[in-house]
């Protein structure tokens, strides 16, 4: 059976530190390794950060939340 590498995409608002992103990558990788039974080298993670003006919840842009 051909091994298919898992690609995980994480979308979140800007503001996390580099250390937080490292920790996220490590923990997500470990979870995928344990559940998908694949080597950690096969796990790919894409982190996409959004500006606060590009995310809305309940019809309100995140940048307008506290106005």
Language-model region placement:
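A domain-level signal for the structural core that forms small-molecule/cofactor-binding pockets
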Residues: 2-67
